[in-house]
């Protein structure tokens, strides 16, 4: 004698099972909202940087900071690492360019616009990481953070050693320009 057959699952159970199958895992990395939104970010930022920080009125002596960016950080196909690197660069750029010691000839409105844009993109990148990954992001990847911290620390020492002169800030402007180009390269990796 055949046993009793199980009743078919209600439609709600089928819908929930389908939803679970189609939903990405909680630890999956998803930065898809940034892809179209950020395609012109670096170039818009470069324009704001040009508007904000015109060249100094007097020529600057040839001075180079001994700061070298760890370009190996850009050679990645890992979208999450690219996003972490871009986020860390943006945070340091924001901290540096929001300094109260920026030169008087820099245009306040353009600087404010650039800082707003940086903050906006920092916020969007932070949202790419799951809430439980925020703690992990603050700790690592350790070498990535140390390399970028060292690079921006070198820039800060350069500014201090040159008493925050307009010429030293002009060098920082050039470094920021290079950072926006690096961010553009990283956002291409995130696509």
From Swiss-Prot:
Statement: the UniProt record of this protein carries the keyword Secreted: yes
GO MF annotation: an example: cytokine receptor binding
PROSITE patterns: INTERFERON_A_B_D
Residues modified by glycosylation: 77, 161
Superkingdom of source: Eukaryota
Induction line: By viral infection.
Any single Pfam family the record assigns to this protein: Interferon
The name this protein goes by in its record: Interferon
